[in-house]
């Protein structure tokens, strides 16, 4: 017969297990109730509840994250704007616009608008810097103008004119290497994405710390550039998990050691090059030479700030330009009539490569129009430049948006909206040349380099590179797509486009002696 002690112990154990089950059930029920009440609040009572959009996106960020991680965010946003209009709530605390609200969100503000505060970058979109120091891309309201004062002169029109000889050396090497491709076993069949990358990465490295990546010299990617391309998808993953600290901690803990080592090497390479350049007495007019002018001033950049800025400028000043050049080439070759017009302008303007100068290509209307149209259809940064609404809130495009909300003009959806453009999906450079068919186009919504005091520092450099390369390419070669049936623009985007190879057949134009 069991003892009273044993019976009591069994009863206690049974009650304890029962209590735990009841407690767990209550906790689960309360969690469901909380989520239900929270969803009701977000959908029907939140200050953003008046903004159009799907209810599932209003009560959870998961649909946004799902499309972000799949590389479909831009096209998902486009479908939402087609359904709901110019302004859409795409997450509980995020709103996307495709109307012209650049002045409201991105411009420098005066008067009453200025009293509301500055629209700062949404840092949740960016990976935490390796050295824990933000670059000019994510800097706060105090640090940004201080950094910009030191960096901007390196990319001014004046400096670019002074640097023309250096830039032209890379243009010549680019053309020479392509001529070599027509003479070897490839028979002129080349991946233009690769060659545009070689060109832009070499130039930005030279302009940042006076040392080329030598991609064009070696006809191959530098190891640092290869590491960059391998990390593109991780940018979107990092942005997604930053919204969920718990998962962020798990990912950091479980990240393979080889990936962590690659990230260390990626950053260390830049830090080492910066250190060597700062210690050098070279007078080479690169970014570091401009930064060194401020080294003894109280507001000069410290070493961590210099490292972070060099890192971000190498990426922002190369990949985006190569992307646009690739897209423009594809669109021209897919539209023979437009290609013929631009080729006629180029070959009617220049008789010899030596005539293709920065000044000369600045006066070519159809070239400018073709590049502008390519930027519209295929913006290198296809999503929006995220900003945080300051203070208690502000009016944006006629809508009251509460403070703390992340807002942006979603570029690809805006550029492909028939509310902004006639024939939005067609490559028609004439829309920028006064063609009356497009007189109702809302071109003010186009800002591929952003706008306001935080617009892209490298806009002038990008324009110079794009114009020179496109002019020389069409002067030296006849081009055709190897696979004209391929829809090359059908790509995933992970902050940047995940570009496919762009296979093109080059045929030299024997109008003069090719570069030797």
Swiss-Prot record:
Q: Where are the transmembrane segments?
A: 20-42
GO CC terms, sorted: membrane
Q: Which CDD domains match?
A: CYP60B-like (cd11058)
Its record classes its membrane topology as: Single-pass membrane protein
Q: So which cofactors does this thing need?
A: heme
* Leader peptide range in chain numbering: none
One Pfam entry name? p450
Coiled coil (UniProt feature): none
One Gene Ontology term of the biological-process aspect is:
biosynthetic process
* Residues reported in the UniProt entry to bind heme: 456
Q: What is its EC number?
A: 1.-.-.-
Q: Which is an annotated GO molecular function term of this record?
A: oxidoreductase activity, acting on paired donors, with incorporation or reduction of molecular oxygen
Sorted alphabetically, which keywords does the UniProt record give? Glycoprotein, Heme, Iron, Membrane, Metal-binding, Monooxygenase, Oxidoreductase, Transmembrane, Transmembrane helix
Which Gene3D superfamilies does this chain map to?
Cytochrome P450
**Residues bearing attached sugar chains per UniProt:** 131, 184, 415, 420, 442
Return the broad EC class: oxidoreductase
Q: Which family does it belong to?
A: Belongs to the cytochrome P450 family.
Write down what this protein is called.
Answer: Cytochrome P450 monooxygenase lcsI
| Organism listed in the record | Purpureocillium lilacinum
């Amino acid at each position: 017969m069991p003892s009273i002690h044993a019976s009591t112990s069994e009863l206690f154990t049974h009650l304890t297990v029962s209590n735990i089950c009841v407690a767990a059930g209550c906790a689960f029920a309360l969690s469901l109730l909380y989520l239900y009440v929270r969803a009701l609040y977000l959908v029907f009572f939140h200050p953003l509840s008046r903004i159009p959009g799907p209810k599932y996106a209003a009560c959870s960020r998961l649909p946004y994250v799902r499309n972000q991680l799949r590389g479909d965010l831009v096209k998902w946003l486009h479908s939402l704007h087609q359904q709901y209009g110019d302004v859409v709530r795409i997450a509980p605390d995020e709103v996307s616009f495709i109307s012209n609200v650049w002045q409201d969100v991105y411009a420098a503000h005066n008067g009453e608008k200025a009293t509301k505060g500055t629209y700062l970058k949404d840092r949740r979109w960016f990976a935490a810097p390796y050295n824990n120091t933000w670059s000019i891309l994510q800097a706060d309201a105090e640090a940004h103008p201080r950094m910009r004062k030191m960096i901007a002169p390196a990319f001014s029109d004046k400096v670019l004119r002074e640097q023309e000889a250096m830039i032209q050396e890379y243009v010549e090497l680019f053309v020479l290497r392509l001529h070599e491709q027509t003479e070897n076993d490839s028979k002129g069949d080349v991946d233009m994405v690769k060659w545009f990358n070689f060109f832009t990465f070499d130039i930005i490295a030279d302009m940042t710390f006076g040392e080329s990546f030598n991609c064009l010299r070696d006809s191959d990617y530098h190891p640092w550039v290869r590491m960059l391309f391998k990390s593109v998808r991780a940018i979107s993953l990092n942005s997604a998990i930053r919204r969920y600290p718990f998962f962020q901690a798990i990912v950091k803990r479980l990240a393979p050691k080889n990936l962590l080592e690659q990230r260390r090497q990626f950053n260390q390479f830049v830090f080492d090059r910066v250190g060597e350049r700062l210690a050098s007495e070279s007078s080479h007019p690169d970014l570091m030479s401009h930064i060194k002018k401020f080294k003894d001033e109280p507001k000069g950049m410290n070493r961590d700030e210099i490292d972070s800025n060099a890192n971000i400028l190498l990426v922002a000043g190369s990949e985006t330009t190569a992307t646009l050049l690739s897209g423009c080439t594809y669109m021209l070759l897919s539209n023979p009539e437009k290609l013929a017009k631009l080729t006629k302008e180029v070959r009617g303007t220049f008789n010899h490569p030596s005539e293709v100068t920065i000044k000369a290509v600045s006066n070519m209307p159809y070239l400018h129009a073709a590049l502008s149209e390519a930027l519209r259809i295929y913006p290198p940064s296809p999503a929006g430049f995220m900003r945080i609404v300051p203070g208690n809130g502000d009016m944006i495009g006629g809508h009251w948006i509460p403070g703390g909300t992340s807002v942006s003009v979603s570029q690809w959806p805006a550029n492909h909206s028939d509310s902004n453009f006639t024939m939005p999906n067609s490559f028609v450079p004439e829309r920028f040349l006064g063609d009356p068919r497009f007189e109702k186009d809302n071109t003010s919504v186009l800002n591929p380099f952003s706008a306001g005091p935080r617009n892209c520092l490298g806009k002038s450099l990008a324009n110079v590179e794009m114009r020179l390369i496109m002019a020389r390419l069409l002067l030296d070669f006849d081009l055709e797509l190897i696979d004209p049936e391929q829809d090359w623009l059908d790509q995933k985007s992970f902050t940047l486009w995940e570009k496919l190879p762009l296979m093109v057949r080059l045929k030299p134009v024997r109008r003069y002696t090719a570069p030797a």
